[in-house]
Amino acid sequence: MAISLGRVVVPSCTISGDRLFIPNFSAICSVSCGRINVGTGVISARRRRDIGGVLISSCLSTDSSSSPPSSSSGPKTKLYVSGLSFRTTEDTLRDTFEQFGNLIHMNMVMDKVANRPKGFAFLRYETEEEAMKAIQGMHGKFLDGRVIFVEEAKTRSDMSRAKPRRDFPKPQSKPRTFRTW
């Protein structure tokens, strides 16, 4: 799908739910404050948004003649990376994982209080093949002195269906007796 951003036309992008995904700018912009008119293919937003240096005006027009890329919309292109060192930066992570393919989005989760990474990140590749190469190439490998784990990211619905943690039996309470001397 092509989108016109003022004077700039982005040839391939995806609209998923309330998010506008533009791989050329490696950014995701929420358009939840606007509305999507499917009949005319017009997305109108009430506010201006900055995506990779391009300011989206109050009206975005879409070209519905071209279809969105199916490879980037699948959940198998999103990876979960855990075990990251607190010293790992976004640049280090990007440089490490770009060798496996076109990395179109990266979210290193930060601890806002301590102002450092929490030790995990989410990555999105353009195709499933690139994501699988990244899993095979980096799962169990060292990055900044720590072993990292790379796997397909689970959706929230998968997490809610997961088997709950085993409940341990509560200790039986006995009446306490205190000795008085």
UniProtKB/Swiss-Prot annotation:
Subcellular location: Plastid, Chloroplast
RRM domain boundaries: 77-155
Region (Disordered): 155-181
SUPFAM superfamilies documented for this protein: RNA-binding domain, RBD
GO MF term (any one): mRNA binding
SMART domains reported in the protein's UniProt record: RRM, RRM_1
Record has Protein transport as a keyword: no
Residue range of the transit peptide in the UniProt record, numbered on this chain: 1-44
Protein origin, superkingdom: Eukaryota
Basic and acidic residues composition-biased segments: 155-169
Record note on disruption phenotype: Dwarf plants and pale green leaf phenotype.
Gene3D superfamilies (alphabetical): 3.30.70.330
GO-annotated cellular components: chloroplast
BP terms from Gene Ontology: chloroplast mRNA modification; cytidine to uridine editing; mRNA processing
Entry function: Involved in C-to-U editing of chloroplastic RNA. Required for the photosynthetic subunit psbF transcript editing in chloroplast.
Assembly: Interacts with MORF8/RIP1, MORF2/RIP2, MORF9/RIP9 and VAR3/OZ1.
Protein known as: Organelle RRM domain-containing protein 6, chloroplastic
Lineage per the UniProt record: Eukaryota, Viridiplantae, Streptophyta, Embryophyta, Tracheophyta
